[in-house]
Regions:
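ABC ATPase C-loop
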Residues: 157-158
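Catalytic Walker B motif of ABC-type/P-loop ATPase nucleotide-binding domains
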Residues: 165-168
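Conserved catalytic motifs of ABC-family nucleotide-binding domains
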Residues: 161
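Conserved ABC transporter NBD signature motif
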Residues: 62-73, 81
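Conserved ABC ATPase signature
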Residues: 140-144, 148
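Helix-to-loop junction immediately C-terminal to a conserved catalytic motif
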Residues: 54
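Conserved ABC ATPase "signature" region
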Residues: 117-135
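The feature captures the beta-strand-to-loop junction immediately N-terminal to the Walker
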Residues: 39-41
Length: 199
């Protein structure tokens, strides 16, 4: 099982007069259990790449293959792709919205149609995996520190049990201590789950 990018390019605004080349002729194979880092300066296309990996964007040119299937095909199941490739956006804490941490992490599994019991089990496992203190499970996510909010947001994606976890600049905006904590936590998640991690 793998994700293959075959000469993938992406252009923003192609039909709107303003053209911005975000990616050009990218070739990449992402295999099972890998830990991969995307490196580049601001505006180099890292966020565009993460959204292509999750199926939110379709390459302007070239192809992405997921489990041997071309994601551009009409009958390709994007819902399944998004369940198997979890995407943690840059500044994911801005997407928290529920009244408690636990409810926020349960949201994804609930929308997958899982039972309440299974949702709660997954939320507990994910929050524990990211090192979140159980005393804070029923606190409002808006009362947490920036680093804690980010852990909750990452746990929300992990609770859906994707096979690949793609994180768009997971340390953006954090202080040095927060960056080290988040990177250490991501490394631990990879070691415990053997999920493929792309960051």
């Amino acid at each position: 099982m793998s994700i293959i990018l075959d000469n993938v390019s992406y252009v923003y605004g192609q039909n709107e007069g303003y053209v911005k080349q975000a990616l050009k002729d990218i070739n990449l194979v992402i295999g099972k259990n890998e830990f991969i880092g995307l490196i580049g300066h601001t505006g180099s296309g890292k966020s565009t790449m993460t959204q292509i990996l999750n199926g939110l964007l379709v390459p302007t040119r070239g192809n992405m293959y997921f489990e041997g299937l071309d994601t551009k095909e009409k009958n390709f199941n994007k819902k399944e792709l998004r369940q198997k490739v979890g995407l943690v956006f840059q500044y994911p804490e801005h997407q928290l919205f529920e009244t408690t941490v636990f409810k926020d992490v349960c949201f994804g599994p609930k929308n997958m149609g899982l039972s309440q019991k299974e949702c709660e089990l997954r939320a507990f496992e994910a929050l524990t995996m990211v090192g979140f203190d159980s005393e804070l499970f029923y606190q409002s996510p808006f009362e947490l520190s920036g680093g804690q909010k980010r852990r909750v947001a990452i746990a929300g994606v992990m609770a859906m049990k994707p096979e690949y976890i793609v994180l768009d600049e997971p340390t953006a905006g954090l202080d040095p201590v927060g960056r080290d904590e988040i990177l250490g936590m991501i490394k631990e998640v990879h070691e415990k789950t053997q999920n493929t991690i792309v960051l």
